[in-house]
A protein has these predicted regions:
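Transmembrane alpha-helices and immediately adjacent membrane-cytoplasm interface residues
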Residues: 1-14
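Charge-rich cytosolic interhelical loops and cytosolic tails of multi-pass membrane proteins
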Residues: 14-91
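Short acidic, glycine/tyrosine-flanked loop/strand segments centered on an H-E-D-like triad
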Residues: 146-158
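Cytosolic/matrix-facing juxtamembrane and C-terminal tails of multi-pass cellular membrane proteins
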Residues: 139-140, 155-184
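Alpha-helical transmembrane signal-anchor/signal-peptide segments
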Residues: 11-19, 170-177
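Transmembrane alpha-helical segments and their cytosolic interface motifs
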Residues: 80-132, 140-141, 146
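Alpha-helical transmembrane segments of polytopic integral membrane proteins
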Residues: 2-3, 122, 174
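Alpha-helical transmembrane spans of integral membrane proteins, capturing the lipid-embedded, hydrophobic core
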Residues: 1-4, 117, 151
């Protein structure tokens, strides 16, 4: 049940991220304005994808229109379906997807986690009454272990679980997904 909640919170953030970025990362990296792939590689991928019925990807930046993103979304869906049905051959894509989903869902639960950590920290401080800073460092066991751990977890969450990490993982997945063009 908690994994479903985490996923729903992560998916909720994902929609906001797509709006902020101007589309899905797999769509963005196919655009000529994006430099994830060099222009020669991008043209080669577009030609390869144009072999699929109904796809007409531009072969030059000047050919991109406002409707081109629909073609890029369709191309991404083709690659995603291929990668999902060939997980044994496309293990890197699957690994990048799992990492992206992990960080997206973790970021989605960040608020809840920080509230829980804060409640535990307040509980520990309340139980001890007065906090002896000297004992926290010199004699932390057993009195201050939970307080120290929860504080470290909260700080770690604040520092490392952030939007930028999720965006980086999203583009890592998008890049590996589009690179499937090399193997189809």
């Amino acid at each position: 049940m908690t994994s479903k909640i985490a996923r729903n919170l992560g998916k909720s953030y994902e929609k906001k991220m797509y709006q902020h970025l101007g589309g899905m990362p797999s769509t963005i990296v196919l655009r000529f304005s994006n430099d994830t792939f060099d222009e020669v590689t991008k043209k080669r991928y577009h030609k390869k994808l144009n072999q699929f019925d109904g796809l007409v990807l531009p072969l030059d930046a000047s050919d991109e229109t406002s409707d081109t993103d629909l073609q890029y979304i369709s191309a991404s869906n083709i690659l995603r379906n291929y990668a999902n049905s060939n997980r044994n051959k496309e293990q890197r894509v699957y690994q990048e997807l799992k990492e992206y989903n992990f960080w997206r869902n973790l970021y989605g639960t960040k608020g809840i986690a920080l509230v829980v950590y804060l409640l535990i920290i307040v509980r520990e401080i309340t139980l001890h009454g007065t906090i002896d800073i000297k004992n926290i460092f010199l004699n932390p066991y057993p009195d201050y272990v939970v307080l120290i751990l929860m504080t470290l977890y909260a700080v770690t969450f604040v520092l490392f679980v952030n939007k930028q990490t999720v965006i980086i993982k999203a583009f890592d997945y998008a890049k590996s997904l589009i690179e499937v063009c090399e193997r189809i």
